[in-house]
Amino acid sequence: MDKIIARLAEVNDSLKGVIDIAHFNDEAKIGKGQEMVDKLTKLIAIFQRPELNFSKNKAEGDDIIGDAYEYLMRNFATESGKSKGQFYTPAEVSRILAKIIGIDKCTDHDATICDPACGSGSLLIRALSEASFEISGYGQEKEVSTAGLAKMNAVLHNKATIKIMAGNTFSDPQFTKENDSSELERFDYIVANPPFSLKNWSDGLKEFGRFSGYGDRPPEKNGDYGKYYYTVRHA
């Protein structure tokens, strides 16, 4: 299984570092010997169920695979509790935020949009879907595994051109000016549903001029205003 997935990643750059980082022979996660065989057999059997064959039910314009992926993420977030749910923005919230930023009225084909705390990418993808034409999307996510989810989410929603980067937006911002890496890149639209009330958010902080002109740096025990300042500097 690992070899097959590795081959898929080799011929698809957007899937490198995404589908090939999970291993089906990881004894720490799925056990050893017969236990591993049984678990993998059950997993494969799930995807062989007739009800999961959507080929005869796909209507024009439907995005069944992408929607199914979001369904799985939503239920994982719900079942895992609030701490795990931070990587997923509910579809209803995503739709409202996408409408608020007015991207549906965009007329600039060179416009850009960024989500500096993109999680699984659901909010960024929804916002891009509101535009009347394809525009460039960018997202950054602190957790490497969640950034992988975002990349896969983008591919399954036919948004493979979205650039998803892993890293802490405070200590390691990934989107900086090409001619000046000390200055943050600017975007036409910013959309985000960041984790609130972060503690010790300033650990390893790199300024990038994010707080100049706004008085004192936000308190260490509450990173909400830090996120706000960061968003303003990126816009």
Model-identified regions with their sequence ranges:
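Non-catalytic, mostly N-terminal accessory regions of nucleic-acid modification and defense proteins
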Residues: 1-105
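Conserved Class I SAM-dependent methyltransferase catalytic core
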Residues: 220-235
